Amino acid sequence: MRVLRALTAATGLALVLSQQSSAQGTRQFQDAWFWGLKMGATSYASATTSNGGAPLIGGEWLITRTNGGLYLSLDQAFVSTTGNFTDRDADSVYVRNVGLNNLRRFTIAGMVFPAQARNLHPYVGGGFVLNQIGGVALTGAPTAISADSISAKKTAFSPIFIGGVQARFKPMSVFVQGSASPAQHTFFLSNISTNQLAFSLEFGIRYNVGSSIDRDK
């Protein structure tokens, strides 16, 4: 009888410890603030390139709650291509070429976390990305009209859709994710002959720097 009671007590204690361990594992992803570093590649198009690709690096923040969260990201893709724009002066209308170097992106998106496991955390989300060309080199003499045209096509907003998975290890997590964003025809990195999506594939690390809520309240 004593052996039976001891086994029962040990089983109960094991269940409690297992539940506490599982809850702790969940809390390390839920209600957390992650800082991350990433690298990968992105696709792009331009007036002279219908299907280009470039490496990228970046940093990001992921703020999680129970079922969703907020994602912020800054990155740069090392793009080198040629774009163009229509220049209108008093005498004629013609196309001028520009050299394009580097793409900077700021992304903000809402995330949801379906089907969570203890150490594996898939996620999907959507939001907006601000795209900006880092360097634009005009061929020929600049004019006030051409400067305005370049400024108008140098930056563009676009919706973005993100999906990925994060795996938790000690002392940090690793992740892989992909994104898709429709190209805006008013932006230098677009090609009017293709209705193209810009795709990115990224992988990196995230470190949990603390709680995203005030647990003292």
Predicted regions and their residues:
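Predominantly the C-terminal beta-signal and adjacent terminal strand-loop region
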Residues: 79-85, 161, 166-217
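Short glycine/proline- and aromatic-enriched beta-strand/turn motifs that initiate or cap beta-hairpins
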Residues: 19-70, 206-217
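Outer-envelope beta-barrel architecture signal
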Residues: 27-35, 66-70, 118-124, 155, ...
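Transmembrane beta-barrel strands of outer-membrane/channel proteins
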Residues: 35-41, 72-78, 124-130, 165, ...
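Membrane-embedded beta-strands of outer-membrane beta-barrel proteins
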Residues: 57-59, 106-110, 124, 161-163, ...
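Residues that define the transmembrane beta-barrel architecture of outer-membrane proteins
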Residues: 31-33, 51-57, 100-106, 120, ...
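Gram-negative (and chloroplast) outer-membrane scaffold detector with strong preference
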Residues: 60-143, 207
